[in-house]
From Swiss-Prot:
This is Peptide deformylase. Keywords: Hydrolase, Iron, Metal-binding, Protein biosynthesis. The active site is at residue 134. It catalyses: N-terminal N-formyl-L-methionyl-[peptide] + H2O = N-terminal L-methionyl-[peptide] + formate. Binds 1 Fe(2+) ion. It comes from the Bacteria. It is an enzyme of class 3 (hydrolase). Pfam families: Pep_deformylase. Belongs to the polypeptide deformylase family. Fe cation binds at residues 91, 133, 137. Coiled coil: none annotated.
């Protein structure tokens, strides 16, 4: 297992659209394992392969309080959206920034698990929000894309400044 580097906005690689996984093989299983380790190391609840510069449709998450309900979504697709909710979101690729985002309140998602078995899941609340957030990453979209251009620009400038300061240190 390995901890992978998480890309940070405004890195253009975060805008790459992920390709479907052709076969759930040992390489994909290793990626899933590494992504879980990376997510836990970063204290996250979800991670898309795009965020670790692997452009395949793989998402891992665990929204449980005890971090003991790991979920894997390979080639995920949302087949139903119901209702609307607004909640504050953050992202490992946009560190230290949070904003209110409107999402569907309840969803149904179909995907493959880490063994390549198909499943369908009805989700609501935090799980539904997290799934939608992570699936956006697979399309090259970030939660800040839902914000006004002015707010997005402020976040970009702040993160660019932090990166410059870190590079000097």
């Amino acid at each position: 297992m390995a901890i992978l580097d998480v890309l940070s906005f405004p890195d253009e690689r975060l805008r790459t659209v992920a390709k479907p996984v052709e076969e759930v093989n040992d390489e994909i299983k290793q990626l899933v394992s590494d992504m879980f380790e990376t997510m836990k190391d970063e204290n996250g609840i979800g991670l898309a392969a795009t965020q670790v510069n692997r452009h395949v449709q793989v998402v891992v998450m665990d929204v449980s309080e005890d971090q003991n309900e790991p979920r894997v979504f390979i080639n995920p697709e949302i087949t139903r959206k119901d209702g609307s909710t607004i909640s504050e979101e953050g992202c490992l690729s946009v560190p230290g920034n949070y904003a209110k985002v409107e999402r569907a309140e309840a969803i149904t998602v179909k995907a493959l698990d880490q063994n390549g078995e198909a499943f369908e899941l009805d989700a609501e609340g935090l799980l539904a929000i997290c799934i939608q957030h992570e699936l956006d990453h697979l399309k090259g979209k970030l939660f800040i894309d839902y914000l006004s251009p002015l707010k997005r620009q402020r976040i970009r400038k702040k993160l660019e400044k932090e990166a410059r300061l870190a590079a000097k240190a």
